[in-house]
Amino acid sequence: LVASQVSNAVMGFISNFQVALNPQITKDYATGNITGMERLSYLGIKYSFLILFMMAFPLCLNIDYVLHLWLVDVPDYAALFIILIMIDALCGTLFGTPFMTSLSATGWIRNYQIVVSCIILCIFPIGYIALKFGCSASSVFYISIFFTLIAGFVRFLFCRSLIGYSLKKLIKDVLSPVAGVTVLSLPLPVFIKYHFLEAQTLGNFISLCII
């Protein structure tokens, strides 16, 4: 429940940002401006990821402090579940609302909805099987992350097939920049956290957020 509350709060902010792009994406398709539509979709995805990353990374890095500040009794595995949910949300953002809006603008959404829905629904039976075979509860979140990425990439393939989106542009304009920012942002705060600011204090939390 705690993990879901954190996820809903963060994703609500991102959804409001992405919704603002929807009218222009639809308008670009209606006027035949596919290049502008694709560019706006990639910009929306990139900035959504970066905004979410800036919110999620400090939270995950200081998750124990935040949970103890928020709750009296922290549920078992709450910290791990929140971190995994944030990772799942970041993966979903990479292939999220702008692609959905793009496909909706075409009107050809039946096959797309069927395929992507089936992929997402696979999380439930496979997660159940994993738990029945004695896997930890966190395994369900790992399974969710995997299928979120698969569903997202399939969503892009439909955009490529129906609209003409370019994989090369996706890599150049979205995946490469966000990968670069993510990789470069991780080492220093993590090093400082575990070598200089291990104590769970408000001052250390604020310092890490600034870094």
Please identify what each model-predicted range represents.
Residues 1-8, 39, 73-82, 204-207:
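Interfacial/gating helices of multi-pass transporter permease domains
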Residues 5-8, 43, 56, 65, ...:
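Residue-level recognition of pore/gate-forming positions within transmembrane alpha-helices
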Residues 110, 117-153, 160-161, 165-167, ...:
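Membrane-interface helix-loop junctions in multi-pass transport and translocation proteins
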Residues 1-9, 27-28, 64-74, 193-197:
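Helix-terminus/linker motif at the lipid-water interface of multi-pass membrane proteins
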Residues 1-19, 23, 51-55, 85-92, ...:
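Transmembrane helix-bundle signature of multi-pass secondary active exporters and lipid flippases
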Residues 14, 38-94, 121-129, 182-191:
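Alpha-helical transmembrane segments of multi-pass membrane transport and lipid-handling proteins
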Residues 86-119, 163, 167:
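Membrane-interface junctions at transmembrane-helix termini in multi-pass inner-membrane proteins
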Residues 3, 7-45, 98-105:
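Helix-loop junctions and terminal segments of transmembrane helices
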